[in-house]
Curated annotation (Swiss-Prot):
Domain Cupin type-1 stretches: 66-213
InterPro entries reported in the protein's UniProt record: Cupin_1, Germin, RmlC-like_jellyroll, RmlC_Cupin_sf
Protein name listed in UniProt: Germin-like protein 2-4
Record's subcellular location: Secreted, Extracellular space, Apoplast
Entry GO CC: apoplast
Signal peptide: 1-23
Provenance organism: Oryza sativa subsp. japonica
GO molecular function, one term: manganese ion binding
Lineage, highest ranks first: Eukaryota, Viridiplantae, Streptophyta, Embryophyta, Tracheophyta
Keywords tagged on the record: Apoplast, Disulfide bond, Glycoprotein, Manganese, Metal-binding, Secreted, Signal
Disulphides: C32-C52
Length: 229
């Protein structure tokens, strides 16, 4: 009995880290295009509730997407435009464990502000322009360089990263994620636009009340924290 118990504990010690390291669940079929109604908006979290459409009724069009041919809407403050594509926008991605995005940066200074994806690693391909890109690891070390057209950089999961157009022409970057729902946490908006008490931010960042009000105004009106005691 003791020997069996030791064997079981050893097996768990081997399997649990591997299970914890997994990303999205593995598919149990070739693909699953959800039967959610063509052209109808679908929440990403609700997709597993829909049955798969019959493979006999699928065409190549169900696995093609044209929504990233053009840039999204540019932010006048940052010169950034983003188009995110998950299975909610492109049902053909469902159960395939991936999503992607298009990022456009206006000439001479367009920036994708520091942010991170809590559930995915990202690979970013510079399709056009010159982009200064990088990430910061959990030890505070910066890994950054200027990427030329055709070059790729990887941003590890949950690491803060950014992109800045350092060229004289607009830049376009395509990002691919190893999760259907990578999530995104934008650092400036999260810190200064979420309603964190002013005393916390003033003390943490050494800001005066006037400086803090300016940042809160830029990144959105404070919202009452729903989970605050």
């Amino acid at each position: 009995m003791a020997h069996r118990r030791r064997c079981l504990l050893l097996l768990l010690a081997v399997l649990l880290p591997a299970m914890a390291a997994r990303g999205d669940p593995d598919a149990v079929q070739d693909f699953c295009v959800p039967d959610a109604g063509r052209g109808r908006p679908v929440e990403l979290a609700m997709l597993p509730a829909y049955p798969c459409r019959s493979p006999a009724n699928l065409t190549a069009g169900d696995f093609a997407f044209s929504g990233v041919r053009a840039a999204g809407n540019f932010s006048p403050e940052t010169g950034f435009a983003g188009v995110s594509v998950t299975p909610a926008q492109f049902p053909g991605l469902h159960t395939l464990g991936m999503s992607f995005a298009r990022a456009d940066l206006s000439a001479a200074g367009g920036v994708n502000p520091p942010h991170y994806h809590p559930r995915a690693t990202e690979t970013a391909l510079v399709l056009a322009g010159r982009v200064y890109a990088g990430f910061v690891d959990s030890g505070g070390r910066l890994f950054a360089k200027v990427l030329e057209q055709g070059e790729v950089m990887v941003f590890p999961r949950a690491m803060v990263h950014f992109q800045l157009n350092v060229g004289d022409t607009p830049a376009t970057v395509y990002g691919a994620f190893n999760s259907e729902n990578p999530g995104i946490v934008r650092i400036p908006a999260t810190v200064f636009g979420s309603g964190i008490r002013e005393a916390v931010l003033e003390r943490a960042f050494g800001l005066t009340p006037a400086e803090l009000r300016r940042l809160e105004k830029r990144f959105g009106p404070p919202k009452k924290a729903e989970m605050e005691d």
